[in-house]
UniProtKB/Swiss-Prot annotation:
The gene is ctaB. It is an enzyme of class 2 (transferase). One of its GO terms (cellular component) is plasma membrane. GO terms for molecular function: protoheme IX farnesyltransferase activity. Gene3D superfamilies: UbiA prenyltransferase. Carbon 2 of the heme B porphyrin ring is defined according to the Fischer nomenclature. Pfam families: UbiA (PF01040). It is found in: Cell membrane. This is Protoheme IX farnesyltransferase. It comes from Bacillus anthracis. The keyword Plastid does not apply.
Length: 307
């Protein structure tokens, strides 16, 4: 980018900064939406660990508090650090150009320091549960910040797979807070569901935002290999979810039916993409379905334990 272009970009960025409150800026800095959605999976892991170990939530309210707050701080911390790392490419993408590290609402130094502080504070809270919960939190943070944000995101199309490891860790944090052995197979089914789910979820988003990723120089699969290969990959990973509910028979037949219907619905919608001419519209439908899928699936896991 030459000097004149840089000045023009800076001037445009300044004049288009949206009016936001300090609280809104803080929520954007820590990516509160991501923190909230992952908190559901943390709680599900915690709840199911209680259920399968015959423990009462009322006897473990302190651990529940430390787990939710600790994991939330860890996730907020790594999201802060991601904003710090991506501050040079975020202005190039429509969905990220209003982040506070781009608009100047928060300076890079603050984002870095604040991210590290709340990350460490999160580890302290998790340590009040079990060391294994801290280890799971560290694995998730290291994978997201180092292996994904710093290494693979800008170099390899496998960045989505690598990033999915960190996103699959939250339910293990919740489980480890109660049962540090992580010996129950359902704990690892939660990990696998989250790991596999994220890949078609984010590939659908990458199709929707393909021009933005291309402009930012991020080698997402649809940018490098096009929509047809991306759709095939989405289908492969979606089909991989199909057998997982049958390894979770401990949650009962009702859950297995709900999960299987959700999987079949996603697969059918996926196959529809090979007949649909509007790939972008289809990718939006797949993305929205994935969000509803995850919410219904994890809420169902909790609800069925009451019956």
């Amino acid at each position: 980018m030459n000097h004149a272009t840089s000045e023009l970009h800076d001037e445009s960025a300044v004049t288009s900064i949206p009016e936001t409150t300090r609280l809104q800026d803080l929520k954007a800095l820590v990516k509160m939406g991501i923190v909230n959605s992952n908190t559901l999976t943390v709680f599900t892991g915690f709840w199911l660990a209680l259920h399968f170990n015959g423990l009462s939530v009322m006897d473990n309210l302190d651990k529940l508090f430390f787990t939710i707050v600790g994991s939330g701080l860890v996730m907020a911390g790594v999201c802060c650090l991601n904003n710090y790392i991506d501050r040079d490419i975020d202005p190039l993408m429509e969905r990220t150009k209003t982040r506070p590290t781009v608009t100047g609402k928060y300076k890079p130094g603050f984002a870095l320091t604040f991210g590290l502080v709340i990350l460490l504070l999160g580890f302290v809270f998790l340590l009040l549960t079990t060391p294994m919960a801290v280890l799971m939190g560290f694995i998730g943070a290291f994978t997201y910040v180092v292996l994904y944000s710093l290494w693979t995101k800008r170099k390899y199309t496998l960045n989505t797979v690598v990033g999915s490891i960190s996103g699959a860790v939250p339910p293990l944090i919740g489980w480890a807070a109660i049962d540090p052995s992580l010996g129950h197979p359902i704990a690892w089914m939660l990990f696998l569901i989250m790991f596999i789910w994220q890949i078609p979820h984010f590939l659908a988003l990458a199709m929707k935002r393909v021009d933005e990723y291309r402009n930012a120089g991020i080698p997402m699969l649809p940018v490098v290999h096009g929509f047809e290969i991306t759709k095939r990959q989405i289908m492969i990973w979606t089909v991989c979810l199909l057998p997982l509910p049958f390894y979770m028979s401990g949650l009962g037949i009702t859950f297995m039916v709900i999960a299987t219907l959700l999987n079949i619905g996603w697969i059918v919608l996926g196959f529809y993409g090979f007949r649909k001419k509007d790939d972008i519209k289809w990718s939006v439908q797949m993305f929205v379905y994935s969000l509803n899928y995850l919410t219904i699936l994890f809420v169902s896991m909790i609800v069925v334990t009451f019956f």
